[in-house]
């Protein structure tokens, strides 16, 4: 694989390059709603809107990066098929986009992958292979497949095209809330947080970007504190979409997040579960654990109104959650 463009290029892209990515994304999926919730403002202070990526095709923001990468590859490069690894949502996204483009997709996932996400991948025609008990084991198997077959690898986060695709979330936010002052996003591998921050900077916005990590999926958070990518043992978490490492040889997203994300907070498992329950019971939104971390930070008072002057947008990044499990959470909310 060739080295990606310099990280600085992504944040300093001219707007027409971002518009090209957005056009390719919109050729396959429409914009998701960005909706103001006055009741949230009344409870937690300020002007609060939610960017509802849980309503996205395949149930998460990940479809944006998959579209950006697969269309950037071009018909010839992708004709023999692509390989991906995923803890769930990226796999669903690649499976669906590959199906739309008539491209074979082989996707490696850990054995604990959410059954809803696994079913979605298979329904969209992907060759899904369950490998190991961690995301990193599945990733290692995917890289072996790439070496064996020579097929392009669609990285779940550490790729300029993927991060740019995720950054189109910010472009749609600016269309609806052009004066946004704070954008709250989940943080795992850094594709969404880094892409959103870079897109905002490229469009002249100095909105604060707040990245929220799950307590049991905090590799990027700890890596940033250490000043270099780290490896941590994976832990079981309700925010399974945020599981996995960031790779010791991370070439794109670590620097994107380090340079352009302004603030970091960490939320506990119980807070994530409470946020899922509140979203379902009071906002009538189906939100998975990884998609609820931004709401959890808001609900738990980690982002008080006095620290949020001007409009705030929380990115609800995904909604792929088992109905039975969500019902149990709602009962406890």
Residue ranges and their predicted role:
Residues 1-333:
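PLP-dependent amino-acid enzyme catalytic core
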């Amino acid at each position: 694989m060739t080295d990606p463009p310099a990280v600085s290029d992504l944040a300093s892209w001219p707007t027409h390059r971002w518009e090209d990515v957005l056009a390719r994304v919109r050729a396959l999926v429409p914009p998701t709603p960005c909706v103001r919730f006055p009741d949230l403002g009344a409870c937690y202070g300020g002007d609060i809107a939610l960017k509802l990526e849980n309503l996205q095709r395949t149930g998460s923001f990940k479809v944006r990066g998959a579209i950006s990468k697969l269309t950037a590859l071009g018909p010839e490069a992708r004709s023999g098929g692509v390989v991906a690894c995923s803890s769930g949502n990226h796999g669903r996204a690649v499976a669906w986009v590959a199906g739309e483009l008539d491209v074979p997709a082989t996707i490696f996932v850990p054995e604990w992958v959410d059954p809803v996400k696994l079913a979605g991948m298979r329904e969209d025609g992907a060759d899904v292979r369950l490998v190991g008990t961690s995301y990193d084991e599945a990733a290692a198997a995917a890289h072996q497949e790439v070496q064996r077959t020579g097929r392009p690898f669609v990285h779940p986060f550490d790729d300029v095209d993927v991060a740019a695709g995720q950054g189109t979330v910010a472009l749609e936010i600016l269309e609806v809330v052009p004066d946004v002052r704070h954008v709250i996003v989940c943080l795992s591998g850094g594709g969404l947080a880094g892409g959103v921050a870079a897109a905002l900077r490229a469009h002249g916005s100095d909105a604060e970007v707040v990245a929220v990590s799950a307590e049991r999926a905090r590799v990027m958070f700890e890596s940033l504190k250490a000043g270099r990518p780290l490896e941590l043992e994976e832990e079981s978490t309700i925010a399974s979409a945020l599981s996995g490492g960031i790779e010791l040889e991370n070439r794109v997203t670590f620097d994107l997040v380090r340079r352009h994300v302004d603030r970091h907070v960490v939320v506990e498992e119980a807070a994530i579960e409470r946020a899922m329950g509140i979203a379902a019971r009071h906002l009538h939104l189906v939100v998975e654990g990884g998609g609820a971390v931004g709401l959890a930070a808001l609900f738990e008072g980690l982002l008080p109104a006095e620290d949020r002057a001007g409009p705030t947008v929380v990115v609800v990044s995904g909604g792929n959650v088992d109905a039975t499990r969500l019902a149990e959470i709602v009962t406890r909310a």
